[in-house]
Amino acid sequence: AQAAVLLDADSGRVLYGKNEETPMAMASTTKIMTCILVLENAKVEEEVSISAYAATMPKVKLYVKKGEHYTVRELLFSLMLESHNDAAAALAEDIGGKLLGETKEASEHTTEESKAALHRFAQAMNEKAVEIGCEDTWFITPNGLDATETLTLPDGSILEKEHHTTAKDLACILRYCIRESSQRDLFREITRTQEYCFTENGRSFQCHNHNAFLQMMDGAFTGKTGFTNKAGYCYVGALERDGKCMIVALLACGWPNHKTYKWSCLLYTSPSPR
């Protein structure tokens, strides 16, 4: 990994770091923030309508269709187990629209209205990152797809921002999700589930958890994988063992054809505290 951190979840202390404060793309590990924001702003039994824009998200996807309805719970399992990009967009558009004060369903949105709702959700992600204590994190997309945006500063100058975080910030976000959020129990429940099946709109779906560490490592109970061409393979996860909880975040862990790099056995092996 080009960047890594091992964090004591109880104290927030960094036990090991490698380029842990260097900003990098983080791919679908982004979705831990999307998940916790949705949990904090919606009830899992609420229904989400699908917009035409959400349905156009690239693979990996659930293949939702405009006008369909899913529960927040169903989309959250789709989001966190299978890492579906359209589920992320649908959830973000629903919450973002509510934050904008909208009353109509997302299925009635124009493309510009959908983008405005997603932008508002990204603002909420960045506000939450500041609240958590992140020092160099910027969210643009709810699914972690690589993105850049142009900001106009108060003095009129232009600033280019990329979707990014640091290994340390990413670990701090997961710490918030499992330790501090009022919805931490639901977050843990969703991210530790191995399989979730549901039927909606006349179709049946099966979601399987792609976090292999839940099976590979004793005590592993949550986490999220990620990959984009820019970010490479990424991972953030937590483990409870011997009365301690540790969080690891890894960014830029290689690119194809190196998907089988054997770094897993070292993930939660803490070196001497620094």
Please report, for each region that a protein language model flagged, where it lies by residue.
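Domain-terminus/edge residues, biased toward the C-terminal soluble/receptor-binding domains
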Residues: 155-270, 274
